[in-house]
A protein has these predicted regions:
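Dynamic helix-loop-helix/coil hinge segments at AAA+ ATPase domain boundaries and subdomain interfaces
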Residues: 10-26
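AAA+/SF3 P-loop NTPase mechanochemical coupling elements
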Residues: 105-106, 112-120, 150-169
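Conserved Walker
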Residues: 128, 145-161, 173-178
Length: 182
């Protein structure tokens, strides 16, 4: 496992770097999350640097950052994929050849993108508390197993490399206990 080199335990940058000011507790939490390969939940008021933390972690580990910004209308399944049945129906009526391959109508979500990456990435799930209360619980299995099933194609999508997952919350509403325990 690799250490988060931006804020290692022994460094002159005890309070962060030129781009990010950090506490010892935050450095320890990030390093524990990276080492244990568990998602890190960062809570705080808007504008306190939660999103910037994910950017700095990705930079320090020299990894790509995949950002999934959550809105009040976002569904957990959108992080996996979306199937566009309406366009497929229209294309079938027009005799389009694309209709023969259902994959042409699957829009990959940010989790799918992170899972299929050939190299490890940092996945930011930004402002998870904006979604409905069931949103976090709907992702539990996928985040635990690092895989999900695509019913339309009949394939199981497994993470090639386990992403480093950073989840932010503005404390607008409480996250479910089951989600926090994992």
């Amino acid at each position: 496992t690799q250490k988060w080199t931006l804020f290692p335990y022994t460094t002159l940058f005890r309070s962060g770097t030129k781009n990010y000011v950090s506490t010892d507790d935050l450095r320890m939490a990030v390093n524990a999350s990276v080492t244990l390969e568990r998602p890190l939940i960062i809570k705080g008021e808007p504008g306190t640097g939660k999103t910037l933390l994910a950017i700095e972690v990705a930079k320090s580990l020299k990894m790509d950052l995949i950002e999934w910004h959550i809105k009040s209308t976002t569904k957990a399944s959108q992080g996996l994929y979306e199937y566009d049945a309406v366009t497929r129906l229209r294309d079938s009526q027009l005799g389009d050849e694309r209709v023969k391959d259902i994959k042409n109508y699957i829009k990959k979500g940010k989790l799918w993108e992170a899972f299929e990456s050939d190299k490890q990435v940092v996945l930011l799930v930004d402002e998870i508390d904006k979604a409905d209360i069931e949103f976090p619980n709907d992702l539990l299995q996928e985040l635990d197993r690092m895989e999900f099933y695509c019913y339309e194609t009949g394939e199981t999508i497994k993470a090639k490399k386990r992403p480093i997952i950073i989840i932010t919350s503005n404390n607008e509403k409480e996250l479910p206990d089951a989600f926090l325990r994992r």
